[in-house]
């Protein structure tokens, strides 16, 4: 039976894609390619046991995406949450750090387009 292998990409609209791409490059250190996108390779996630790509619909009434009014939230797995938060602070980006969870550490920021970004430092799975 044919099956989906995983997420092949996330594509979204922006009123100023160039400025938004620069923000992700400058604030979060994403390696933006000449064509304007970022490629995440499987080996980067594989190097961090416990990391995974999750696809989850939320109830339409959820407040978890707040303060954003966007219909989606992006979760970015990171290898050093404290380091990313320090970079955010240097760029004037406010972050909300959540209590540690069994699957890792989380913080929330909002990008210039108003999209909530969840930063996740995975905790290794119990073996």
Task: State each model region's role.
Residues 2-5, 11-54, 90:
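Core segments of cupin and vicinal oxygen chelate
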Residues 29-69, 109-110, 116-123:
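Conserved short beta-strand elements that form part of the metal-binding/catalytic scaffold
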């Amino acid at each position: 039976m044919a099956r989906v292998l995983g997420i092949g990409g996330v594509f979204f609209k922006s009123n100023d894609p160039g400025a938004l791409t620069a923000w992700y490059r400058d604030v979060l250190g994403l390696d933006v390619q000449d064509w304007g996108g970022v490629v995440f390779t499987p080996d980067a996630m594989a190097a961090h046991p416990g990391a995974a790509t999750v696809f989850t619909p939320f109830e339409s009434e959820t407040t978890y995406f707040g303060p954003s009014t966007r219909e989606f939230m992006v979760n970015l797995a990171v290898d050093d949450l404290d380091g990313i938060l320090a970079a955010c602070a240097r760029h004037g980006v406010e972050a909300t750090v959540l209590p540690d969870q069994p699957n890792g550490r989380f913080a929330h920021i909002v990008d210039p387009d108003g999209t909530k970004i969840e930063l996740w430092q995975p905790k290794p799975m119990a073996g």
